[in-house]
Every structure is written in structure tokens, then in C-alpha cells.
From Swiss-Prot:
SUPFAM superfamilies in UniProt: Cytochrome P450
InterPro entries according to UniProt: Cyt_P450, Cyt_P450_CS, Cyt_P450_E_CYP52_ascomycetes, Cyt_P450_E_CYP52_fungi, Cyt_P450_E_grp-II, Cyt_P450_sf
Gene3D superfamilies recorded: Cytochrome P450
Induction context: By N-alkanes.
Catalytic activity, EC: 1.14.14.-
Gene Ontology MF terms: heme binding; iron ion binding; oxidoreductase activity, acting on paired donors, with incorporation or reduction of molecular oxygen, reduced flavin or flavoprotein as one donor, and incorporation of one atom of oxygen
Catalytic EC class: oxidoreductase
Entry superkingdom: Eukaryota
Family: Belongs to the cytochrome P450 family.
CDD domains the UniProt entry points to: CYP52
Keywords attached to this entry: Heme, Iron, Membrane, Metal-binding, Monooxygenase, Oxidoreductase
Designated name of the protein: Cytochrome P450 52A9
Binding sites annotated in the UniProt record for heme: 468
The organism of origin for this protein: Candida maltosa (Yeast)
Length: 521
């Protein structure tokens, strides 16, 4: 029987294949409708045109990312639906249905109230070549174990210790003075500054990337195999990871020689420090003065792979997020001299300026008392969140509270395995939550009573069980550097004709695509 039918099926494949696809689609549609009724959900209000299996969407997303317009592209998608004010839309991306939301109620459900309904999905596959099995790539028990292991390393006494930052600020200051009176890219310096401070916190020994020949140092004094190419390799590897995430099911296409070479350079750099920690005797680990993240971790595990993976996960956060925040802050402060002047007044009253500046009183506690400084930092985090967009995968059939029906206020059905992306950057710039001036840099908004009630509409450090462990570390370091900049420099100036809003480079974290070219007077 089968022997008779099979040749005919093969002969008429051009009829059979489309027929099977249609049947599959109809069965899937009927099943989805049944489940929607069961969960009392409504169809998604904004369903966008997909093109051919979402392939044009995917290609456009990669092109826009490479042009520094990933966030603008996402905002355009929100505006393209029949109900633009509904903060959720559905579209295809490289054959995969993706639900994108900026609705705080949906984000709250994904990250907190329905936390168990969602996982990281294929994030481990996307990011594993570089980051391995770390706190940012693991789910379930692996993630819980990582978090339990790392949480003590971010205790208040560790993150509040600002004295380690000052020597690196002095190196940064020399570079700024070297460029006095001319425009220079301070973002490039901030990335070097944060890798210097992060490696000292993590490994007990700074990579000292700021101490170069231009300010009178010999780089050979700090050299080791893997150090020289680390920064460039780390940046390049992250670009590849960002593209792998966009490609979804086809992430494996990005696995070429250049990517592997970048990953190998980063691993060589990290392995140097891991091996030093493993080679240290228990007595050396115990008596080492000051706090060293890796030495504390070695007392919990001696697996070099675990040590490398967790260190790299934390290094990513410690370097990139703080450097991005500082760069965006200086960019906006150079654009808004009146804000810089008000900061000078506040910091001058608390810690002194210029020749009268002191650092003895700058601490975790005193920085939290600088209200206008906190407002400026919050406004930078609002407009330029370090991780502007993220995603989850549904672990079972479930719902999200809003985004369905004629007005977008009804629950929507989320099928098991569905990709759900949440766009924090789009939430932070939505007039519904921040008023008509949502796209303007305005630190004064943080003194208004309504801003205190934002809840899940302000989420610079994620939320729920996976909220960022290093939140206070990043805020303390960024605030300290801003205070020291304010104490030492009277005026900032931005390059004339600078494009605004700025183009943003979005990989695993966000930074300025064209750098932050300022002049310090």
C-alpha cells in the first residue's frame, strides 16, 4: 500500500507539501483558539505584517542595530500597529513568532508575579561560547546556585568601598587633563576606567589599561599574555552575541573564525587571573589584605571553568554597564550646562570643589544623600538603560494581563515555547508614564510625587528574582566618578553639531555608537 502511494506523493510534492503546511496551520489555529477560550484570553490587538516568514523583519533588525538605531526601530514597530497606544505587538522574526511589550503590567508578570512561567530559553546557546555557564546565562537550579554563590560577594561593605576607585580616577584625570582644551572621546576612557576598577575588585589586580605611555607609564610593566587584545576582543565578541540573539533559531550561523578568535582572547585574559587565584595557597588567600571577589569564590569552588564563567559574567556587568552609564551622563551634562552648574552647587556644599575638594567624606552613605546627583543618575538610567531590551520563553501555556481585545486591555494567550521580549527603553520613554516631555533630559522630574509611584515603569536594573545583584555597586561607582569629575572640572562642552538623540550601540548592553566627544575647561 505504502509502496504504491509513496511514488505518487514524491511525484506531486509541489501539491502535497503546501497541503500539509495548510493542514498544520489550520490545526494549530484551531488548537490556539481552543486554548484562548480556556484561558479567557483575547487575540493580540497589534499584529504586524511579517513579510516572508519574518525574514525581512530579521534582516531589518540587524541592519538597524548595525546603524545604531535598534531602539528607534523598536519604537517604530510599536507605532506601526492599528492601536499605537497599546504597548504590545506580535510579529515574526526569522520564522519565529515574537511578542514584544513595553507595558509595565506585562513586564511585572514576566519578571515577578508569573516568574515560573518564563525562562531564558536559548540564551545559554546564544551566549555560551563567550560567557559559559554563568549567572546571566543559566536558568532553574543552575541559576539559583550561581546567585546563592555570588550574592555574598555584593554585600554592602564590599560595594560601598569607594577607596579602591580613587587611584583609577587619578589615571583617568591625567588623560582628561592631557586633552584639556580639545575634544576627545571620554567614553573610550570610561571603558578603560571600568575595566581597571572591575579587574581590581574581581581579581585583586588591575589590568591598568589607563596607565599608558601618553601619561608617562610603560605598558610592559603591566603586560601578560591576553591582556593587550582583551578590550577589543570583548567588544567584538559581544557584537557577535547580539547578532546571534536576533537570529533566534539560526543563531548557529554566527560561529566563524573571527568570533572564535575573539572568544579565545577573552578566555585567555580571564584564565590568567583564575590560575593565579588557584595557585595561591590557603594561607595566602586568607591573609590577603582587602576584598577580592575571585579569592572569595575560590573558597567555594576550585573548578577553573566555573571560576572563569562567573568572573566573565560579572566582568561584563562591572565594565560595560557602568561605562555606558557614565558616558551617557557626561554626554547629557555637556549638553545641559545648567544641570552641571546645579550639580557643582550640591557637590560643592557637601564635598568641596577645586582646591577645596576633599574625598574623605565621600562614601556609600553620603553619596545616597546627594538628591540632585541621584536625580541626574536616575534620568540617565531612564533615557539610556544599560540593557534596553530582553526576552524570555514561555515554559508552559500561560497569559499576560494586557495587550488583547479591541482596546488592548484584555489578557493575551502565550503559548508554551513562545518568545516574549520586553523593551525597557521604550517603557522609559513612553509619555503615558513620563508625560509629554518623556524624551527630554529633565532630572527635575524625579522630585515630582508622581515619579515616586512609577513601579514597574522604571526598571534600569531588571526586577523580580533576577534583579541585578550589582545594582548598588554600579550606582556607587558611577556616582563617585561623577562627584570627582564635578569637583575637578568647571565646564563641559559637547562637540558642535552633535546628533541628538544620539545613535546607540546595542549588543548585550548599550553605549554611545559614536562615542562621547567632549571638551573640558
Amino acid at each position: 500500500m505504502i509502496d504504491e502511494i509513496l511514488p505518487k506523493l514524491v511525484q506531486y510534492w509541489y501539491i502535497v507539501l503546501p497541503t500539509l503546511l495548510i493542514i498544520k496551520h489550520v490545526v494549530s489555529y484551531i488548537n490556539t483558539q481552543r486554548l484562548m477560550r480556556k484561558f479567557r484570553a483575547k487575540p493580540v490587538t497589534n499584529v504586524l505584517n511579517d513579510g516572508f516568514f519574518g525574514i525581512p523583519n530579521g534582516i531589518k533588525a540587524i541592519k538597524e542595530k548595525n546603524k545604531g538605531r535598534a531602539q528607534e526601530y523598536n519604537d517604530e514597530k510599536f507605532a506601526a500597529g492599528p492601536k499605537p497606544k497599546v504597548g504590545t505587538y506580535l510579529f515574526k522574526l526569522f520564522t519565529k513568532d515574537v511578542l514584544v511589550t513595553k507595558d509595565p503590567e506585562n513586564i511585572k508578570a514576566i519578571l515577578a508575579t508569573q516568574f515560573e512561567d518564563f525562562s531564558l530559553g536559548k540564551r545559554l546557546d546564544f551566549f555560551k561560547p563567550l560567557l559559559g555557564y554563568g549567572i546571566f546565562t543559566l536558568d532553574g537550579e543552575g541559576w539559583k546556585h550561581s546567585r546563592a554563590m555570588l550574592r555574598p560577594q555584593f554585600a554592602r561593605e564590599q560595594v560601598g568601598h569607594v577607596k579602591l576607585i580613587e587611584p583609577h580616577f587619578q589615571s583617568l584625570k591625567k588623560h582628561i587633563i592631557k586633552n584639556k582644551g580639545q575634544f576627545f572621546d571620554i567614553q573610550e576612557l570610561f571603558f578603560r576606567f571600568t575595566v581597571d576598577s572591575a579587574t581590581e575588585f574581581l581579581f585583586g589586580e588591575s589590568v591598568e589599561s589607563l596607565k599608558d605611555e601618553s601619561i608617562g607609564y610603560d605598558q610592559q610593566d603591566f603586560d601578560f599574555d591576553g591582556r593587550k587584545n582583551f578590550a577589543e576582543a570583548f567588544n567584538k565578541a559581544q557584537e557577535y552575541l547580539g547578532t546571534r540573539a536576533i537570529l533566534q533559531l539560526f543563531y548557529w550561523l554566527v560561529n566563524g573564525a573571527d568570533f572564535k578568535k575573539s572568544v579565545a582572547e577573552v578566555h585567555k585574559f580571564t584564565d590568567y587571573y583564575v590560575q593565579k587565584a588557584l595557585d595561591a595557597t590557603p594561607e595566602e588567600l586568607e591573609k590577603h589584605s582587602g576584598y577580592i571577589f575571585l579569592y572569595e569564590l575560590v573558597q567555594q569552588t576550585r573548578d577553573p571553568k566555573v571560576l572563569r564563567d562567573q568572573s566573565l559574567n560579572i566582568l561584563l556587568a562591572g565594565r560595560d554597564t557602568t561605562a555606558g552609564l557614565l558616558s551617557f551622563a557626561l554626554f547629557e551634562l555637556a549638553r545641559n550646562p545648567e544641570v552641571w552648574s546645579r550639580l557643582r552647587e550640591e557637590i560643592g556644599d557637601k564635598f568641596g570643589l577645586d582646591e577645596d575638594a576633599t574625598i574623605e567624606g565621600i562614601s556609600f552613605e553620603s553619596l545616597k544623600q546627594c538628591e540632585y546627583l541621584k536625580a541626574v543618575v536616575n534620568e540617565c538610567l531612564r533615557m539610556y538603560p544599560s540593557v534596553p531590551r530582553n526576552f524570555r520563553i514561555a515554559t508552559k501555556h500561560t497569559t499576560l494581563p494586557r495587550g488583547g481585545g479591541p482596546d488592548g486591555k484584555d489578557p493575551i494567550f502565550i503559548k508554551k515555547g513562545a518568545v516574549v521580549s520586553y523593551g525597557i527603553n521604550s517603557t522609559h520613554l513612553d509619555p503615558m508614564y513620563y508625560g509629554p516631555d518623556a524624551r527630554l533630559f529633565n532630572p527635575d522630574r524625579w522630585s515630582k510625587p508622581e515619579t515616586k509611584k512609577l513601579g514597574w515603569a522604571f526598571l534600569p536594573f531588571n526586577g523580580g528574582p533576577r534583579i541585578c545583584l550589582g545594582q548598588q555597586f554600579a550606582l556607587t561607582e558611577a556616582s563617585y566618578v561623577l562627584v570627582r569629575m564635578i569637583q575637578n572640572f568647571k565646564e563641559l562642552e559637547l562637540t558642535p553639531n552633535t546628533v541628538y538623540p544620539p545613535r546607540r550601540l546595542t549588543n548585550l548592553t548599550m553605549s554611545l555608537y559614536d562615542g562621547a566627544y567632549i571638551k573640558v575647561n
